[in-house]
Swiss-Prot record:
It comes from Saccharum officinarum (Sugarcane). The keyword Chloroplast applies. GO terms for cellular component: chloroplast. This is Uncharacterized protein ycf70. Belongs to the ycf70 family. InterPro entries: Ycf70-like (IPR035337). Keywords: Chloroplast, Plastid. It comes from the Eukaryota. It is found in: Plastid, Chloroplast. Its main location: plastid.
């Protein structure tokens, strides 16, 4: 039973840190884009973002929503002595 409880604790921690890592990666990518635009960049590319970058940004935000909203975190632990 203790192993069962530890498994669920590690599972919840893994889900939390995985979503945290995804959010920090998203912030890092947006920071790089802002720096590129802030340094002058190309006038032509400044107004138009890369469509692959936008697609990645949308897919990563969807996956983080799945982690928080579709995971059932209720843990039932029955101790019988």
């Amino acid at each position: 039973m203790v192993l069962y409880a530890l498994f669920y604790v590690f599972l919840v921690l893994f889900i939390f840190f995985d979503s945290f890592k995804q959010e920090s990666n998203k912030l890092e990518l947006s920071g790089k884009e802002e720096r590129k635009l802030g340094n002058g960049g190309d006038r032509l590319t400044r107004d138009f973002l890369d469509p692959l970058y936008e697609e990645f940004e949308e897919s990563s935000s969807e996956s983080s929503d799945v982690n928080f909203h579709q995971v059932n975190l209720s843990i039932r632990i029955c101790f019988s002595f």
